[in-house]
Every structure is written in structure tokens, then in C-alpha cells.
């Protein structure tokens, strides 16, 4: 972290940026990516991309709002325990030299939204439920004895800018952890969707 808190990866006509989460969150990272792409298009092709819709002006001084630590500004005095039950952890076979595989799935957005609507959940909740179902099925294969299984959880980031009037580009996200306990029995996909949806509604306010 002290050497470099983020890095830009380029491969053919694709690039990605990896951030240490203390630096920023998904919102700040997306703004950086848009601004970086705008600058690339400017230098490579001479295109002028206006500094709007999440694109910052490279030569402009950052505002105090962009640099603000919104956690310090909006944090209250209420303290809550962060202790949770232990979740089941995925395991795999490490690749040689720390190599990591990237699996990409492309889904038409209209179809994804329509599917989420059928289950009465948001797209985020639908994808979370799908991951939880896959993890539960994998755990059932690896841990045949139900009583030895552990809760299935997915950590979902929540953009706190939707709850507080903040324009910070620093990390301003919280997390919600929907879960199902396979020791209580098998869950249908509808039941998992409902569990995720109600957990999100309970905590995301």
C-alpha cells in the first residue's frame, strides 16, 4: 500500500484499474476511470470530452467536497457490534506465481432487469441471490453432512452518498451481509431473493 495504492492494467483494447479500498470506493473509482478514459481519448485521438457526468477536469483544482472524509462528517454516536457468525469460505487451487483468472459474463441489461422484476427484487439483489445459491450448492457438494455446514453470506457494498448529501471521492461505502443458513434446510431461489431483499431493506436506511 505504501508503494502504490492503485494500478492501471492494460490488455489490447481493454483496461482496468485496481484500488486499495482505503483510497476510494466504487463510485470514486468509476469517476477516476471515466476521467482517465477521457484523457486517453484526448491525447490519443484529439477528442474533447466535457467534464460532466462523472468526468473531472484534469487541470481543475479538486473541491473541498471531493476531498472530504464523509465518515467523520456524518458518523453518529451510536456504536454497533460487528461480530457475526462465521461464514463458509470458498477455497480453490492456487495458480503458479500467484496468477489469477478473470471470468467475465456479459448479460443483456434489459433481460437482467426483467428477470429481477419477476422476482420482485433489484438487479443487485438478484445477482447476490444467484451467488448465494451457487455457493450453497457448492457447499452441499463439499460438506454432505448438513449439520457441519456454515452460513452462506455475500458482502454487499452500499453507496452512502445515496443516504447522505456527500460529493466525496474518497471511500464512503458501508456493507450489508445477507445470509442464509443451510443447516436449517434447503432454500428455493425465491426464498433466497426474499432473504436478500428484506435484509437490504432493513439495513439500507
Give each language-model segment a name.
Residues 11, 23, 27-31, 35-114:
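Non-catalytic, low-complexity flexible loops and terminal extensions
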Residues 29-30, 37-38, 43-45, 52, ...:
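Alpha-helix boundary/interfacial micro-motifs
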Residues 1-16, 30:
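Well-ordered mid-protein domain cores that form the structural environment of catalytic cofactors
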Residues 1-6, 104, 113, 137-205:
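Acyl-thioester-dependent acyl-group transfer interface
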Residues 36-47, 131-142, 200, 204:
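A generic secondary-structure signal for well-formed alpha-helical elements
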Residues 11, 20, 157-159:
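Structured loops at beta-to-helix junctions and adjacent beta-edge loops in soluble globular domains
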Residues 13-15, 99-101, 174-176:
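Short amphipathic alpha-helical segments
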Residues 17-34, 102-147:
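Acyl activation and transfer enzymes in specialized metabolism, enriched
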